[in-house]
């Protein structure tokens, strides 16, 4: 979350069109309205400009709009990839499920010509960065990238061609066609200025998906109508005074149902927050502490992650002090040998990340910040080694074997 308590001479918010996102939009709106900067630069899709101008009328800010053209051309191809034998160095093939990503990686590497880096949302940020660096390195043999939609955010990549393995994704509610902004954001990662390629290309794995790709790239993005917001604790607290003897879950549910918003705003999806509230409502915690746990970075659909949050909250309620060693044994982490073990390690990383997040806000009560941080790093390194080993299922070069040995020594 952006720091809205300090003063800055200049600040930059990238991908500002994300303020219209149903799940993450509130964090961009919060940054836009809350960052105390003499000058604030907003980068992103022009579709967000009218809404931003409308929002900032209220604050009295001076808004200047400067438009820039893409420096390198993006060329939608007329033919699909068709076969994995047509994969080439610099390609990025996109899937929208973790299972799909590893399936594609295996198919490409089975051909024996390429090794694949992978980038997807549930990988630790450190691992995503290292996978991207390995793909960008011309001396690396990992010359193809397989990625989820996380590719569109926060990574600089030397991609020559984007290949959509599908033009549909499951959004948590239904399997639907990709939206126009989603297509543009992902396709636009090919041939970025500063990469070694003179242009970017984009196509699909299957011919049946090409019409949606081409129509999306030709169309202007729809103008954003609303920005996401999220109820702050102050609002929840004031509302709670009218809801005597009710738990946070009921207070939140009633607040979201009855609150009246300006036409320029919508409440971001609070489903995750409500799931946490339902779990911790019975604990003897103050409303403010419950709210803190509710806004913490936890995936309640991940069993290990949700158990971690529950244990942290229970220990905090009973003892007022949460030691990491009570639920986690340092030194027990190992390189995963299966995909299920990899997923478990990703979940453990989420728990460690949650502890670090809580330690920043309740530092004396979550005192093992350094231990959690160091174990988090080890977690991401072990995941990294597993991903590299996946690329060694075929006979490998001495250089790759040497690379693995060097990394293992760093873990010890």
Give, region by region, the residue ranges found by the protein language model.
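Conserved two-lobed SF2 helicase motor
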Residues: 1-5, 138-156
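Post-DEXD/H (motif II) to motif III coupling segment of the RecA-like Helicase ATP-binding lobe
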Residues: 10, 17-73
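Walker B catalytic acidic pair
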Residues: 14-16, 165-166
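Conserved interdomain hinge at the start of the Helicase C-terminal
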Residues: 23-27, 34, 68-110, 135
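Conserved segment of the helicase C-terminal RecA-like domain
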Residues: 39-49, 139-140, 157-218
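Conserved strand-helix element at the start of the C-terminal RecA-like helicase core
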Residues: 41-43, 48-50, 84-112, 116-120, ...
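Conserved helicase ATPase core of P-loop NTP-dependent helicases/translocases
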Residues: 103, 117-148
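Non-catalytic terminal extensions of ATP-dependent helicases
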Residues: 231-412
């Amino acid at each position: 979350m952006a720091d809205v308590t300090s003063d800055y001479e200049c600040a930059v918010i990238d991908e500002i069109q994300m303020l219209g996102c149903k799940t993450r939009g509130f964090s961009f709106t919060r940054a836009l309205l809350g960052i105390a900067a003499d000058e604030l630069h907003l980068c992103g899709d022009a579709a967000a400009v009218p809404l931003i101008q409308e929002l900032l009328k209220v604050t009295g800010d001076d808004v200047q709009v400067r438009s820039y053209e893409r420096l390198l051309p993006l060329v939608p191809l007329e033919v699909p990839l068709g076969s994995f034998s047509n994969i080439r160095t610099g390609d990025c093939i996109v899937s929208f499920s973790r299972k799909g990503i590893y399936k594609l990686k295996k198919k490409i590497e089975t051909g024996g010509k390429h090794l694949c880096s992978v980038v997807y949302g549930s990988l630790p940020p450190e691992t995503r960065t290292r996978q991207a660096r390995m793909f960008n390195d011309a001396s690396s043999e990992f010359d193809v990238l397989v990625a989820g939609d996380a590719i569109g955010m926060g990574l600089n990549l030397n991609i020559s061609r984007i290949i959509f393995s599908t033009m549909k994704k499951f959004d948590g509610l239904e399997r639907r066609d990709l939206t126009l902004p989603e297509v543009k954001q992902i396709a636009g990662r090919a041939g970025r200025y500063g990469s070694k390629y003179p242009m970017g290309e984009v196509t699909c794995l299957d011919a049946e998906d090409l019409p949606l790709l081409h129509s999306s790239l030709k169309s202007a993005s729809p103008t954003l109508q609303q920005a996401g917001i999220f109820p702050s604790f102050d609002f929840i607290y004031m509302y709670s005074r009218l809801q005597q003897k009710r738990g946070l879950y009921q207070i939140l549910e009633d607040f979201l149902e009855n609150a009246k918003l300006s036409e320029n705003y919508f409440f971001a999806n609070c489903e995750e927050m409500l799931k946490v509230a339902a779990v911790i409502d019975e604990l003897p915690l103050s409303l403010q502490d419950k709210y803190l746990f509710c806004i913490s970075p936890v995936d309640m659909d991940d069993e290990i992650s949700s158990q971690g949050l529950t244990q942290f909250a229970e220990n905090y309620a009973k003892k007022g002090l949460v030691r990491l060693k009570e639920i986690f044994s340092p030194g027990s982490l190992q390189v995963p040998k299966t995909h299920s073990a990899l997923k478990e390690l990703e979940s453990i990383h989420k728990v460690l990340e949650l502890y670090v997040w809580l330690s920043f806000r309740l530092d004396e009560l979550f005192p093992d910040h350094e231990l959690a941080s160091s174990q988090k790093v080890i977690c991401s390194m072990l995941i990294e080694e597993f991903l590299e080993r996946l690329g060694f299922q075929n006979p490998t070069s001495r250089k790759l074997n040497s690379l693995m040995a060097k990394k293992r020594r760093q873990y010890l």
